[in-house]
A protein has these predicted regions:
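Short glycine/serine/threonine/alanine-rich loop segments
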Residues: 23-24, 72, 110, 140, ...
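Alpha-helical recognition/docking segments in bacterial nutrient-uptake
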Residues: 1-99, 165-166
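Hinge/beta->alpha junction and helix N-cap segments in small-molecule ligand-binding domains
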Residues: 1-10, 28-37, 89-99, 115-162, ...
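Glycine-rich phosphate/diphosphate-binding loops that line cofactor/substrate pockets in enzymes
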Residues: 103-112
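Flexible loop/turn connectors
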Residues: 160-263
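Periplasmic-binding protein-like
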Residues: 49-56, 113-116, 147, 169-179, ...
Length: 263
């Protein structure tokens, strides 16, 4: 089961490759808020499903529990819950945010600000941990970082950042953004207000979406190997299907900085 999120296309390519390699047939289902999960799970089992890849980016613990009781092997992708015994393949969000923030500091020699998502999910909170860790490691005070809470979409972040600028709130010399969409929207608002990027304000994003190369200037960001992430998730699911072991694992996919022109 997957939800429709921005990196779904590349992730699904990896899942498809992994399934073909393991000789599994892939069926993609979309689940919506009002769907009866128990009924869907029963139907999948009736149709002979061997396992479930669950893209849980925006899911909470109570959303996951029906899958842990369904009797089928499950691998959770892009989320993790310490209280649930469940295999997962996730992004090393803390590492990525740390690398991005550390790079910002070394490029600008300035206290970084944070374009933080106003919509809270596990991944963004892990990125917040990485952001503040980099600040502490560079001998800076976390309390001095300017934080703006912006909608995690291009249009939403653009409108929110316009409001921040109009209010006269303090702006930072450089910003780490929770994702590329927030970065793109904020950059547009800053540019329209007369700020030059990166000469006046530097910005770095997270996810390395295709749009990054089309933004002016091209957006520096954190690359997540989404296709590889999908392949690894299938490999782990196949191991569970073919094993009697009850041990669960958490696999974190490492990230890397992509240096472009925004910082």
């Amino acid at each position: 089961m997957v939800q429709d999120v921005p990196f779904f296309s590349q992730l699904s390519e990896g899942i498809d490759l992994g399934c073909r390699h393991c000789h599994y047939y892939l069926n993609i289902s979309y689940i919506y808020e009002n769907d009866d999960i128990e009924t869907l799970l029963s139907e999948w089992k009736r149709l002979g499903a061997k396992g479930i890849l669950l893209l849980g980016t925006e899911m909470e613990k109570h959303d996951i529990k029906p899958f842990t009781r369904c009797g089928l092997p499950v691998v959770l992708i892009d989320n993790y819950f310490e209280a649930l015994n469940l295999d997962c393949v996730t992004i090393n969000n803390l590492q990525g945010a740390y690398l991005a923030t550390d790079y910002l500091i070394k490029q600008t020699h300035a206290q970084p600000g944070y374009l933080h998502s106003s919509y809270i999910i596990t991944g963004f909170e892990e990125r917040a941990d990485g952001f503040y860790k980099a600040i502490r490691k560079n001998g800076m005070s976390t309390s001095r970082s300017v934080v703006h809470h912006l909608s995690p979409t291009v249009d939403g972040a653009y409108c929110d950042m316009k409001a921040v600028i109009k209010s006269g709130d303090e702006l930072a010399r450089c910003y780490f953004a929770d994702n590329d969409l927030i970065a793109a929207g904020a950059m547009r608002a800053l540019s329209e207000a007369g700020y030059r990027i990166p000469e006046d304000i530097s910005v770095i994003g997270f996810d390395d979406m295709p749009m990054c190369t089309y933004i002016t200037p091209p957006l520096s960001t954190v690359h997540v190997p989404k296709q590889y992430m999908g392949e690894i998730a299938v490999k782990r699911l196949a191991e569970i299907i073919n094993s009697t072991s009850a041990s669960h694992v958490k696999i974190e996919i490492s990230t890397e900085i992509i240096k472009r022109k925004s910082c």
